[in-house]
Amino acid sequence: MSSEHLNWKSRELTESDDNIGIHAFYYGLGWQKEDFKKPQIGIGTPLHEINLCNMHSYEIGESVKEGLSEAGLLGYRFGVPSVSDNITQAHSGGNASLPSRNVIASSAEMVTTSHRFDGMIGLHHCDKNGPGFALALMRSNLPGFILSGGTIKPGCLNGKDLTIQHVYDEQAAVEVGSSTKGKLLEVVKHACPGAGGCGIAASFNTWGIAMEAIGLMPPYSSSNPAEGDEKRAECKKAGEWMLDILRAGKRPRDIITKAALSNATAMIGASGGSTNGILHLMALATEAGVNFGLRDVQKILRGIPVYCNFAPRGRGTMIDLFKMGGTPMLIKHLIEVGVLDGSVPTMFADSLAEQVADAPAIPEGNDLIAPAGHPYKPFADMQICFGSLAPDGIVFKVSSRLDPTFEGTAICFNDVDLLVTAVTEGKIQPGHVVVLRGMGPVAMGMPEVLVATSALSTPKLDGKVAFVSDTRVSGVSHGAIGVHCSPEAAVGGPIAYVRDGDPIFIDLLKGEINWDSRGVMELGGEFKAYSGSQIYLREFANSVSQANKGCVNKSLLSND
């Protein structure tokens, strides 16, 4: 793209006398004559003041806008809806979380393409923000990237760091009588001290480090804290990055290849990341038109050891990574140990290895990133299984188990509250495979059921039961968890037919999950598409694909 035509799209409006009425609006914005030849960049801003993850998004957007201006570009913030994955936990509001990702993608696509922007920067604040903007970039293929709003700093109580995970773990402890409400209240008051996304390897940070590994997020962006000089400096540099991208003529679809998606998968596995990251990668591959599915993910994760000790599997936070040297340091290490392919191009460099070349080496004796040849675990916490219970796949995360096999009998629930009650009443015992169904994308938007996994994380059950569901879990969850079971119950998937007492066999390294129906096939309840009063959920249910395709719009899929 020649330097004089960096406004490659907006010039349709700014350099044509046929659009004189539009020019009147531009002059009303305070433009001068020279502004009509400047590239216009949309800044996707998920405004949401009541959510800690997003409360500073307007200020982050303003800093990005200033950086674009310093580079001779015109930056304009535009708003998209955002749903807090924490505030919507444990009630029907959680049904909005995953649909919000698709709404963000459509909103950003609509605004940027209709206004003829020359590029887009999407701000990643809460879990579904960054994935939504990434999908929008695949659709429009506009020059651009995702920039993280930054991670929250840890809270502190009695000299010990706290995260949001401690709140849910303490809540579970109170429910089984091993802690007190007074102690829980103190943890609640001190766990979240300010702005930023959840500070552990939950969904927000999983997507951030995956996007750095895939080349769609600038170096250090995922690990820089939300409140700090580094984040503001990074925002100011956004203009320099965007100008380089425009001059080079780079487009997002140029870098979202099978090799890049493999890198993102390996990064999620090596870091002990969230299952939601895999769901979004499936969506990204589908939107980008890349032939990359759960079978590919299965093959990659089988060969990936766990190199990071982030919570919830360990104790580390993104602030710990930031203090050590940031995400580029981790990427550089994973390239050196053979987990990541350093040759893939990024939006910011000719190769990923070049992008992180100046990053420091991991410190000796640190307790966050394992040295070469000494991983924390020989196989990834996350594995993909197929079989009679999940013909199209299920995503497992088993941070609390070293044994890759599990055999147990089903205990089935069609309601998450009944599951939690069963835990408190002692009905769920070690050896059970807890089946929660009828909560998939078509049934109710595929909400996160952190309340269920928290209930199962008590000392009596943690690592001693398995959890299988057609819905999602929060990235702060831990235990033996299988989610995104495809097909879901609402479309007639086998999970709808499991009965209490049915044997279920899981072998993570073989990638198998099988179920013995004992010769009886009868529905375990009434499972159907959402038909309630929320219109956006009806629209989502009518248009959404299954989890193995990333829950994108069905119109993107071929008919075969």
Indicate residue ranges for each PLM-predicted region.
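Short, surface-exposed connector motifs at secondary-structure boundaries
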Residues: 114-119, 431-433
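Short catalytic-loop micro-motif centered on adjacent basic/acidic residues
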Residues: 119-122, 199
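N-terminal glycine-rich "phosphate-gripper" loop used for MgATP/nucleotide binding
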Residues: 101, 123-126
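Short, well-structured alpha-helical segments in soluble
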Residues: 104-115
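Catalytic or ion-coupling anion/metal-binding cores of large enzyme and transporter domains
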Residues: 1-55, 60-81, 86-97, 126, ...
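Well-ordered mid-protein domain cores that form the structural environment of catalytic cofactors
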Residues: 97-105
